[in-house]
């Protein structure tokens, strides 16, 4: 995969009109887009279907979690939409149900381990007695056992997650901040170059591109930073 196949731009905007303008601005530079709750509830599912039909790859970030049958039914319908990736929380029974429902569809299911906006204090407040690092590795192992296609985790855990899940699973990393950019509300962040060197296979970049004065230039800067990490001489 080249950098263009690995960069996922998060369409973190409130309206379809804004998303359409952004996709038009970025043009052929960007192949892969993430669509989450904000846009889904503004009519984003139909927009996602249209983008996929136009040749773009879509990462539908729904973070599903429910009883097995409900998760399976949702995954079956999403698989028919031509999506490339779908997230669900990394709970074993839900993951197993999703894997069975997606079989043969080409949909890559991603287990969400610990949100990159969370740290140990946040987990403790939510009732977890594990630190983020330990919980990520535990859930990564459960995702592999369930037959998931990949993991969502911070780049800080990518190298150890790779040891847990083996060579074939995708490691999708949010919380990516290009060199010199603001961290925003993310607590576990890394640059594109460092994330790829750490073992991430796909990088999700939202606000540093979407909110940039010149999104196309910002996207190209990220791609260039990624190329630097992927170039054989830098391996």
Swiss-Prot record:
EC number: 4.1.1.23
Coiled coil: none
Pathway terms, separated by semicolons: Pyrimidine metabolism; UMP biosynthesis via de novo pathway; UMP from orotate: step 2/2
Enzyme class: lyase
UniProtKB keywords: Decarboxylase, Lyase, Pyrimidine biosynthesis
Biological process per Gene Ontology, one example term: 'de novo' UMP biosynthetic process
InterPro entries assigned: Aldolase_TIM, OMPdecase, OMPdecase_AS, OMPdecase_bac, OMPdeCOase_dom, RibuloseP-bd_barrel
Binding site for substrate: 12, 34, 61-70, 116, 177, 186, 206-207
GO cellular component: cytosol
Its job: Catalyzes the decarboxylation of orotidine 5'-monophosphate (OMP) to uridine 5'-monophosphate (UMP).
Name of the protein in its database record: Orotidine 5'-phosphate decarboxylase
Source organism: Rhizobium etli (strain ATCC 51251 / DSM 11541 / JCM 21823 / NBRC 15573 / CFN 42)
């Amino acid at each position: 995969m080249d950098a263009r196949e690995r960069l996922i731009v998060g369409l973190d905007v409130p309206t379809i009109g804004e998303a359409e303008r952004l996709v038009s601005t970025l043009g052929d530079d960007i192949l892969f887009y993430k669509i989450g709750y904000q846009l889904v509830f503004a009519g984003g599912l139909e927009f996602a279907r249209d983008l996929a039909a136009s040749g773009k790859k879509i990462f539908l970030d729904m973070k599903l979690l429910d009883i097995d049958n409900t998760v399976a039914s949702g995954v079956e319908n999403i698989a028919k939409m031509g999506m490339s990736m779908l997230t669900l929380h990394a709970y074993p029974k839900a993951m197993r149900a999703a894997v069975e429902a997606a079989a043969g569809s080409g949909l890559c299911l991603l287990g969400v381990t610990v949100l990159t906006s969370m740290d140990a204090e946040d987990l403790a407040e939510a009732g977890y007695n594990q630190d983020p690092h330990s919980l990520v590795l535990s859930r990564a192992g459960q995702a592999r056992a369930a037959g998931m296609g990949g993991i969502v985790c911070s780049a800080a855990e990518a190298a150890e997650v790779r040891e847990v899940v083996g060579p074939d699973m995708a490691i999708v990393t949010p919380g990516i901040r290009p060199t010199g950019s603001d961290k925003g509300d993310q607590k576990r962040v890394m640059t594109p170059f460092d994330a790829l060197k750490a073992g991430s296979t796909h990088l999700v970049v939202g606000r540093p591109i979407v909110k940039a004065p010149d999104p196309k230039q910002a996207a190209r800067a990220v791609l260039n930073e990624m190329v630097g990490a992927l170039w054989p001489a830098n391996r």
